[in-house]
Amino acid sequence: MGCRLLCCAVLCLLGAVPMETGVTQTPRHLVMGMTNKKSLKCEQHLGHNAMYWYKQSAKKPLELMFVYSLEERVENNSVPSRFSPECPNSSHLFLHLHTLQPEDSALYLCASSQ
């Protein structure tokens, strides 16, 4: 049982934010095993052109994972293929997760800007 526990990646997400911020992220918390597939959703209501996914690992600086501008990927800082973004429109940016590793346990944050 101890091995199974070690093989799980725990993803913590930013808590519920007031709607007046204009950016929401769901789900609030996510715990998944290495074989599960899940998605994180970022939605902005500010009319911004750019959206971002960040990763904050314990005792490490904030890491920029993906940048999308006008629904096109602008930057991908050598993120492993087990993280797959999807930007169906300028208001939504998904982060699809699969086959996660223990080192993927982190706080994942989304943001938007002009």
Curated annotation (Swiss-Prot):
Gene Ontology biological process: adaptive immune response; cell surface receptor signaling pathway
Glycosylation site list: 76, 89
InterPro entries: Ig-like_dom, Ig-like_dom_sf, Ig-like_fold, Ig_V-set, TCR_beta_variable
A Pfam family assignment: V-set
Disulfide bonds: 42-110
Recorded GO CC terms: plasma membrane; T cell receptor complex
Predominant location category: membrane
PROSITE patterns the UniProt entry points to: IG_LIKE
Signal peptide range in chain numbering: 1-21
Alphabetized SMART domains for the sequence: IGv
Compartment(s): Cell membrane
Domain Ig-like as annotated: residue spans: 22-114
Keywords from the UniProt entry: Adaptive immunity, Cell membrane, Disulfide bond, Glycoprotein, Immunity, Immunoglobulin domain, Membrane, Receptor, Signal, T cell receptor
PANTHER family (alphabetical): T CELL RECEPTOR BETA VARIABLE 4-3, T-CELL RECEPTOR BETA CHAIN
Record function comment: V region of the variable domain of T cell receptor (TR) beta chain that participates in the antigen recognition. Alpha-beta T cell receptors are antigen specific receptors which are essential to the immune response and are present on the cell surface of T lymphocytes. Recognize peptide-major histocompatibility (MH) (pMH) complexes that are displayed by antigen presenting cells (APC), a prerequisite for efficient T cell adaptive immunity against pathogens.
Quaternary organization: Alpha-beta TR is a heterodimer composed of an alpha and beta chain; disulfide-linked. The alpha-beta TR is associated with the transmembrane signaling CD3 coreceptor proteins to form the TR-CD3 (TcR or TCR). The assembly of alpha-beta TR heterodimers with CD3 occurs in the endoplasmic reticulum where a single alpha-beta TR heterodimer associates with one CD3D-CD3E heterodimer, one CD3G-CD3E heterodimer and one CD247 homodimer forming a stable octameric structure. CD3D-CD3E and CD3G-CD3E heterodimers preferentially associate with TR alpha and TR beta chains, respectively.
Name by which UniProt lists this protein: T cell receptor beta variable 4-3
Organism whose genome encodes this protein: Homo sapiens
